[in-house]
């Protein structure tokens, strides 16, 4: 395919020795959102031909693993796996390379084979990025980060909501290196949530103590939950989770069992 002479990133990639113009997208994403740091362990899903692997290695200098159904031409200092990211066998191989502690960052610039039918291509993109998200959740360490390319469309909001459920910080970002006519956008998720709960979950708890700011405190599987409503120590309540942070959550009270018990006793 003939290249537009105005495609400066294509020619820049050739001049600077990168395998694809996509390299500059990752540079720009990282400059804006500071996802990759020095010595990070990084896994690139759908990594062929390897443009993002080269950038990840340059920024991090740490352990870099590329995964793709196709063979990835060797890159110095980068390990590769030929496999399907939805396969348990591939997940096992990734964990063997990055260690049980998990990866610091998972990146994915993969795109589905395009048919020319936009609705079909968008659906395929969402399916692929959902697989990437599920894989990332299995191989990231707690508070790890995620970058993935998504095609915009009517299912994009639903996908963003899925990412929000799993990460403390989420943003959608379009780097300058993306072509103006492209519908691609990059979703960034920072600080993987490893809490035993999520927004809208409901629990029956006992208020164990009152914090310094007057917040009632309860625990769900040893995870701290702060009440946003007035409660008393020892009170039994039903709560609904309204916000989740890496190390604690906030909840509102939706039922007070002690009050119900008192009402029954009065009857």
From Swiss-Prot:
Which EC number(s) does the record attach to this protein? Answer: 2.1.1.166
Q: Where in the cell is it found?
A: Cytoplasm
The family line of this record is:
Belongs to the class I-like SAM-binding methyltransferase superfamily. RNA methyltransferase RlmE family.
* Catalysed reaction, written as an equation: uridine(2552) in 23S rRNA + S-adenosyl-L-methionine = 2'-O-methyluridine(2552) in 23S rRNA + S-adenosyl-L-homocysteine + H(+)
Q: What is this protein called?
A: Ribosomal RNA large subunit methyltransferase E
Could you cite one Gene Ontology molecular function of this protein? rRNA (uridine-2'-O-)-methyltransferase activity
Q: Does the keyword Ribosomal protein apply?
A: no
Q: What species was this sequence derived from?
A: Methanococcoides burtonii (strain DSM 6242 / NBRC 107633 / OCM 468 / ACE-M)
